[in-house]
Amino acid sequence: MLCLCLYVPVHISERTEFEYFESESLPVQLKSLFKLSLFLPSQEFDSYRKWRKKVVKAGDKDLDGQLDFEEFVHYLRDHEKKLRLVFKSLDKKNDGHIDSQEIMQSLRDLGVHISEEQAEKILKSMDKNGTMTIDWNEWRDYHLLHPAENIPEIILYWKHSTIFDVGESMLVPDEFTAEEKNTGMWWRHLVAGGGAGAVSRTCTAPLDRLKVLMQVHATRSNSMGIAGGFTQMIREGGLRSLWRGNGINVLKIAPESAIKFMAYEQIKRLIGSNQETLGILERLVSGSLAGAIAQSSIYPMEVLKTRLALGRTGQYSGIADCAKHIFKKEGMTAFYKGYIPNMLGIIPYAGIDLAVYETLKNSWLQRFATDSADPGVFVLLACGTMSSTCGQLASYPLALVRTRMQAQASQEGSPQMTMSGLFRHIVRTEGAIGLYRGLAPNFMKVIPAVSISYVVYENLKITLGVQSR
């Protein structure tokens, strides 16, 4: 019969001591754990408390807020199985040992780049016999009761496109761990992200409509400022007009997210990657192709959004009426005006956003990720805001040309220009600055959009039963 395992915390000024008492009938593979006397410096006590909270949450089967001996043993066995899977994924040579090169390669596959010196430092923290390699026993003994996070949890903490919605649809999809896919948590993340996007876009819709108006109507001779633009919209259609075109902008979130995710997973299989996570280049290629497929599928909704945003009060009775007017007057091809610059804008936006975000993520992980891969709210928001801003800045001229091409037929007397012709016309008549009309309201909405989508996403995760970070 198994007796109860006790640990007694003793607070001392310089260290905190934990005594583990061994049970005679404890399973062999767990005995060594209870022969330990751990001496933790006082500054590491917070790490211990975080680890204890995490263990109780993972192993508490009867949900009584406590971990009895049977639950603790079950947790250790289950955790050891997970550690075995992670060890095998790191052991690229299948020789039963992990060296510094394998650690560097595994993190590189995830998008985390470290030097050989840093990899050796990681090895030394686990290497007991000085061989500069880690076998299974060393790996298990170090991680079984250690508060550090494993590699898949970096994916969990650093989700990007799922969490942040700034109104653009060109981000590379997030990676999901095998556990998230097997348990069905992936679709809950997508639903939470979609709901967050709907709230975020609705809250920032006035700025988005102002951006469209400035992209199409603002010129060197017809300057339109932010205050003037808002005044003009309210005078023409009242406060309600500030949200004109927002309905279709929200409706397109669900089909676009679903198509992009399914396409991304299929493209990953087609390029022959069996890894749980892709490298940066593979992610960019797969994500850009998935984005192109999703955008092609819902592009008519993009045209409708632009036309509704530019429409006068009473011009259209709704989305269906707008679509009917466009089809009757201009034909089916009108629903794909501006398609080429839209597709061309995916690569610079997605590429720069991903590169900046991964660079910031790697920098934080290398400098500050000592006990946890969790960056906290402020770091996540800062990284998401900076990467989205850089991506938008790079692709903005293409976005402006796309919007003007979508709007051409709705402007009486406006010549129907090609993409290259419109570029030349803007530069000749307005200068290079003309390619950045509407940039100010576009940037103004980034911080509130990122903040709102994050808060709503976290709350929807709780509602949907997604494991909290």
Swiss-Prot record:
Record field: transmembrane: 190-207, 245-264, 288-301, 338-357, 381-398, 438-457
GO MF annotation list: ATP transmembrane transporter activity; calcium ion binding
First-listed, main subcellular location of the protein, grouped into a coarse class: mitochondrion
Keywords, in A-Z order: Calcium, Membrane, Metal-binding, Mitochondrion, Mitochondrion inner membrane, Repeat, Transmembrane, Transmembrane helix, Transport
Solcar repeats: 184-270, 278-363, 375-463
Compartments (UniProt record): Mitochondrion inner membrane
Biological process terms in GO annotation: ADP transport; ATP transport; left/right pattern formation
Entry membrane topology: Multi-pass membrane protein
A single GO cellular-component term on record: mitochondrial inner membrane
Domain of life: Eukaryota
PROSITE patterns: EF_HAND_2, SOLCAR
Record-linked Gene3D superfamilies: EF-hand, Mitochondrial carrier domain
Function: Calcium-dependent mitochondrial solute carrier.
Family: Belongs to the mitochondrial carrier (TC 2.A.29) family.
Name recorded for this polypeptide: Calcium-binding mitochondrial carrier protein SCaMC-2-B
Source species of the chain: Danio rerio
